Design a protein with these regions (language model features):
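N-terminal small/polar loop signature for handling phosphorylated ligands or for N-terminal nucleophile
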Residues: 1-42, 128-186
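Short alpha-helical
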Residues: 16, 121, 201
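Conserved beta-strand elements of the Class I
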Residues: 29, 112-114, 218
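Gly/Ser/Thr-enriched, mixed-charge loops and adjacent short helices
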Residues: 43-168
Length: 220
């Protein structure tokens, strides 16, 4: 704002939400302050372009170069009406939750799911999505205080979710990492399903429905 840009602050929301909202709301770019799956002191910045895609490495390098130069040389700053405006919009998280729910055509009615939010960005959105799809949701690690993100919880510390699933006789456990751009699953026996196994399950379902192009999955 100090150099003329207008900013909409969405609050604490998942990284994928920013990627979606940038395009859906017609923003020019998105920025996320995130420690991802790391402890809270390790924050970095992720940028998205106006289409919701990560910036190419060469563009990020240019941004870093610009920031370093700006630190050494005072920028010309606007005054008066030229200064950007700040808007706080707490509804953006709900818009993202609504979008996710409506991309899923399967009801979770009758399922008991333990959700581990890693005390992170999806601590509110995750339960909202799952309960909105009809599941009975048992929440753990959904009380972020700014310091406890990823601390012995979430997808990097799956043991607590394994125990909780069996304690509650749940059908499934879902664990996000701190910024909720990845997840692991735990089955009803407490066994962990990693990313490769999750992709396999999704691929088999898509193949069954005739939606898996060339019967091929590409992962990175």
């Amino acid at each position: 704002c100090s150099v003329g840009g207008n900013v909409v602050i969405a609050g604490v929301i998942p990284t994928p939400a920013v990627a979606y909202l940038v395009r859906q709301q017609g923003f020019d770019a998105g920025a996320v302050i995130s420690a991802s799956h790391n402890p809270y002191p390790d924050n970095g910045i992720k940028f998205f372009d106006g289409n919701g895609y990560k910036l190419p490495d060469e563009v990020e390098d240019e941004l870093e170069k610009y920031v370093r130069q700006s630190a050494d040389n005072e920028l010309a700053r606007p005054t008066g009406d030229g200064i950007g405006k700040i808007e706080f919009n707490s509804n953006l998280a709900h818009l993202y939750a609504h979008f996710v729910r409506h991309t899923i055509d399967t009801s979770l009615e009758g399922l008991t799911i333990v959700y581990d939010g890693a005390n992170g960005a999806a601590s509110s959105v995750g339960p909202e999505i799952l309960s909105g799809l009809g599941a009975k949701v048992i929440n753990i690690n959904v009380n972020p205080d700014g310091l406890n993100i990823n601390h012995h919880c979430g997808s990097t510390h799956i043991e607590g979710l394994q125990v909780a699933v069996q304690q509650h006789n749940a059908d499934l456990g879902i664990a996000n990492d701190g910024d909720a751009d990845r997840c692991l699953l735990v089955d009803e026996k407490g066994q962990v399903l990693d990313g490769d196994q999750i992709m396999l399950l999704c691929a088999l379902k898509l193949k069954e429905e005739g939606k898996l192009k060339d019967d091929t999955v590409v992962g990175t």
